[in-house]
Amino acid sequence: MYDDWRVMFNMLEGMYHNHPVKIDIAGTVETIAEITAEKLYEVYNVFYNLNNMILCVAGNVTVDGVLKVADKMLKPCEKKEIKNYFETEPYEIKEPYVEQTFPVSMPLFNLGFKEKADKPLNEKQLACTDILLSALASNTSMLYRNLMDSNLINSSFSYELFEGPGYCSVIFGGESRAPKQAAEMIKQYISDIKKNGIDKEDFEIARKSVYGDSVSSLNSVSAISNSIIDYAMQGNEIFAYIDAVANAKLEDINSRLAEMLDVDNCTLSVVKQPDEV
């Protein structure tokens, strides 16, 4: 849905000063009109290059069989190294609040916490982050129950780690009749948890949940290949991540909590009806 898209990109525009992750890739009428055949070929030849690709095949195949097909179908190309260059991105957010009016049945919000992104997270950091977020905001968490009991969210509420080259953020969001109140409750809950640490029982529930989801995803051949690619692009390995989840300790999670979710470095994005206050 376009409104979901808009609330997220407004948040990214409020968080990031320079990083291109904030740019709406759908473009505008003006930018699309500027596209030429020469530009398309330039982009194609730079990025759709065998030296800039990873091939992953999952299923009832052999290495020799895959290589035979690849050698037949893939066009040889000039060997080149692709490097990305990004402007320096400060740690601090650009704007704490972004709002847009749009014809929606209920206001939407994204609360994004900007994280350090000097280098990609490794398997242990990813595992600890996923367990931490599950303990904080899954539908079995105290935060989720408090938000629901206060009628500040509904079942659309979600959370995610949004990470890539040069950017990293944690996002909470969904539909809310009072987005600012929901955001304040989330920030206050995080502040309280930072003082006391994650409860051991909550940690165990979250660790088992993340581990179970990770293992069950291996039932899907397409999920396996997608996961291998996703992790490989960041220099990681899916099975090392699963092992890290299985071996995670409570102190690892609390250590990760201390490193992230700075309540003074977050952006609230809201999309609401024009006549709503």
Regions found by a protein language model. Name each.
Residues 13, 82-142, 146:
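His/Glu-based metal-binding/catalytic segments typifying zinc-dependent metallopeptidases
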Residues 1-82, 99, 128, 140, ...:
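Charge-rich, well-structured scaffold segments of protease-associated domains
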